Amino acid sequence: MSAADKDPDKHSADADPPLTVELLADLQAGLLDDATAARIRSRVRSDPQAQQILRALNRVRRDVAAMGADPAWGPAARPAVVDSISAALRSARPNSSPGAAHAARPHVHPVRMIAGAAGLCAVATAIGVGAVVDAPPPAPSAPTTAQHITVSKPAPVIPLSRPQVLDLLHHTPDYGPPGGPLGDPSRRTSCLSGLGYPASTPVLGAQPIDIDARPAVLLVIPADTPDKLAVFAVAPHCSAADTGLLASTVVPRA
């Protein structure tokens, strides 16, 4: 009997695939089975690099969805642009040696990760404007000043305390005004899929909130373990294609 057979926990850890960009994209799209998705989400919570990859994927999905809904943008992306997005995603994946399927997750170099995310955003910005790339750039209307310098804002956080989150469990979920998108069960299922949860996941509590002056809906669902709750602040139009995720956290049930 092998050491892995004697130690089920070690065998399970060895059998888990590395947290690659492709695997995390499948998680985000709801393509994994329930058991695998739960294991991956649990590993992501303790892996800052995997969390960084998921944030980059979410940003790209939001940017591309926003461009598709904006009439100011040109026609649909050309195949070459789509290929560029795929190449940028692959560039964020670390090289691995053959036969390492059961090894620990390969290290994602921070510089390469950041460069890949930046490339994704740059490619997303190019969608719909391929026909005008040869046009001369407009001259600046005024010299660059300190007013044009932007600074990074801290990541949004869930504005409710743990007791407030737990209190939502005792009330009927409120998805916003009647007729709102998330009031439709099929739309909620799509939203949960975009968050990486199966359609059977129950919503234990919900409430409209504002985060950084942006409207959102707070969703409380079971976490990966029975003693915890997963809390997500998503856009009112949340769907599998674009969750509009603004913030998330995990709180203990008791």
UniProtKB/Swiss-Prot annotation:
Probably cleaved within the membrane by Rip1 near the cytoplasmic membrane interface. Its main location: membrane. Residues 1-112 are cytoplasmic. It is found in: Cell membrane. GO terms for cellular component: plasma membrane. It is a single-pass membrane protein. The chain crosses the membrane at residues 113-133. The keyword Cell inner membrane does not apply. Residues 134-254 are extracellular. Keywords: Cell membrane, Membrane, Transcription, Transcription regulation, Transmembrane, Transmembrane helix. Interacts with ECF RNA polymerase sigma factor SigM; this should inhibit the interaction of SigM with the RNA polymerase catalytic core. An anti-sigma factor for extracytoplasmic function (ECF) sigma factor SigM. ECF sigma factors are held in an inactive form by an anti-sigma factor until released by regulated intramembrane proteolysis (RIP). RIP occurs when an extracytoplasmic signal triggers a concerted proteolytic cascade to transmit information and elicit cellular responses. The cytosolic domain interacts with sigma factor SigM. This is Anti-sigma-M factor RsmA. It comes from Mycobacterium tuberculosis (strain ATCC 35801 / TMC 107 / Erdman). The lineage of its organism: Bacteria, Bacillati, Actinomycetota, Actinomycetes, Mycobacteriales.
